[in-house]
Amino acid sequence: MRNHGPGSERKDACVSAPDPTFSDDVPADVRERHARLSQDLDDYSYRYYLGSPIISDAEYDQLMAELRDLEAQYPSLVTPDSPTQKVGAPISNEFAPVEHLERMQSLDNAFSDAQLEAWAHRVSAEVPVDAFLCELKIDGLAVALVYEKGRLVRAATRGDGRIGEDITLNIRTIDTVPLRLDESRYPAPELLEVRGEVFLPVKAFEQLNSRLADEGKPPFANPRNAAAGSLRQKDPRVTASRPLSMLVHGIGAHRGVTITHQSQSYELLAAWGLPVSDRIRVVSTLDEVREYIAYYAEHRHDPEYEIDGVVVKVDDVSLQRRLGSTSRAPRWAIAYKYPPEEVTTKLLDIKTSVGRTGRVTPYAVLEPVKVAGSEVEFATLHNAQEVARKGVLIGDTVVVRKAGDIIPEVVGPVVEKRTGTERPFVMPTECPECGSPLGQQKEGDVDLRCPNTRYCKGQLRERLAFIAGRKALDIEALGYVAATALTQPLEPAEPPLRDEGDLFSLTVEQLLPIRTLVLDPDTAEPKIDPKTGKPKVVSFFANQKGEPKKIVEKLFQQLEEAKKRPLWRVLVALSIRHVGPRAAEDLARHFRSLDAIAQASEEELEAVEGIGPTIARSIVDWFSVDWHREIVEKWRAAGVRMEEEGADDGPRLLDGITTVITGTLEKYSRDGAKEAVQKLGGRVTGSVSRKTDFVVVGANPGSKYDKAVKLGVPILDEAGFEVLLTQGPEAARAARLSEDESVLS
């Protein structure tokens, strides 16, 4: 959610620019730029408030920063009407206006560690701070609830900070908002004004958009817009049909209760039955604040709601009063903003690429833009139906999203910015790599596929790159350029590999003559050499003297290591459709050898936990193809492992045991811990349930730890994990953490 907003007056969807004091020391071009920025920011904020923004939060923040810089350089430009001095949003005439009991302020932002440190030093220089409260900054809609003698009497949007809109009827439809406070532990105060954030959980947002698409209605761009649109419905029944939720994060006006610390207020709010986040932490140093920020930067998608940063507050309320506020924000709090995950940019073109299983996928060619900390030029569009559903046209300004390590995707168009020159995308009818006619694998498929699985060089390149990946045989030296060199070299005319079966039979003599294009792994398009402006060509395996580069020795060493990988990794490396790591692990644990899997019937495959009819049919179909079986035999002849370790040794120590691993372990990487369990016959899953036997916790465990405590699942620290691996489940249960022990203490 933005921490800034437009003014309270609006005429014809556009606010008049502020009338700054015209002094001789302000150049005319600066005054003009200030007026333009002020007008634009007010307009952008109004559209944001309505749930239909036309620029991203990141772009808004950049413009606001520019305006602040101008006003810092020329203080005479600062007026009460400047966007830098205002809070919230304008009041529409669709809801009754209501005055807040206490002004709902915004927050100042920190976009870097240096800005966070500067804030902390300013605060500590004025008051003796001994504790900070850290909480997640929910990307939702700010509201205020008013309770009188424990009964909800009013709810309002933030509005301009002084006057909001009465949304009481709509708020009453949200299940998590109590209509009466719970007084079983503490009596309800005479008056209580509660501040919080209304949001739409991510899964609920996806379901809502799917339903809207089925009804032929335009989808929402993101959960924040969906929450705003849902909460501002004239008909409360529409709001009730949307699974909105709320978390409260502060108290405004109050009578009949004494608040000494921010953290104490949260304890009271929770006791009264109000929804409070379970991810709040009170810390004593700035370094601990940094640790909290860093943890949720990495685990940004653990919560059920979207976040865009961390709010840091001075915990002591008496110190908050001493620090006071500016006209728009408290001095005792700051919002540390994470790099934006959504930005707007130009959709230059839509092209297609072929994947390892033959699926031909449209992708967006974008005007380069920075999102989530990295520059993005391409984004996935999944399939032709998805392009149509999103309503994007070539030439559109589009919203692009990149969440963590997830591949960037185009969310949708900014329709208001269309010029009439945009054009629709037409899905090609031929493979972009080999020219084979595209078709559906079965009736009703949304994907078009290239059927030329054996001879399409594009598919082979993608399969080879996949084999080298961490989820398969983990051959670091066999990257995307090497995969291209081995399957589609410019020289020699005949590639060293005709299929992946030959991978373990490569020789140095085959590699040295190779010259190849350098392709982009996201698009398979040639990369351009900035010096020549032409496609980049390299001699990948040989130096200028024609001698092997170090990469050659490394490649052959890693190929030998790959032969010893666990059976499940070999199964994944075969690129059988629908068989990912989880299914492969289940199959390897059950059948113990690749031959047994190849010979199993559909019924026998479906009998394995986690294997359904789609996966079973896909496996049977794959092994029925002659050249697929030839790949297996070539690998077997080269010495690739085809059985589970100890396949003939009978039952193993952790047979039937399901484990979840969370947090950072000292002796094991996440994959290493997982494989240690699997070698002993155990299963590692990604979620905690009543069927989970153990949860292993390291440093900074996430919500899985909390769920394990709630469900009573045995929790092991790293020492207990060693007991599990060496002595088995019975001994591990005896080594579990007791209820009064905590990995978080």
Swiss-Prot record:
GO terms for molecular function: DNA binding; DNA ligase (NAD+) activity; metal ion binding. Its cofactor is Mg(2+); Mn(2+). Zn(2+) binds at C431, C434, C450, C456. InterPro entries: BRCT_dom, BRCT_dom_sf, DisA/LigA_HHH, DNA_ligase, DNA_ligase_AS, DNA_ligase_CS, DNAligase_adenylation, DNAligase_N. GO terms for cellular component: cytosol. Residues 1-27, 216-235 are annotated as: Disordered. It catalyses: NAD(+) + (deoxyribonucleotide)n-3'-hydroxyl + 5'-phospho-(deoxyribonucleotide)m = (deoxyribonucleotide)n+m + AMP + beta-nicotinamide D-nucleotide. SUPFAM superfamilies: BRCT domain (SSF52113), DNA ligase/mRNA capping enzyme, catalytic domain (SSF56091), Nucleic acid-binding proteins (SSF50249), RuvA domain 2-like (SSF47781). GO terms for biological process: DNA repair; DNA replication. Keywords: DNA damage, DNA repair, DNA replication, Ligase, Magnesium, Manganese, Metal-binding, NAD, Zinc. It is an enzyme of class 6 (ligase). NCBIfam families: dnlj, PRK07956.1. Belongs to the NAD-dependent DNA ligase family. LigA subfamily. This is DNA ligase. The lineage of its organism: Bacteria, Bacillati, Actinomycetota, Actinomycetes, Streptosporangiales.
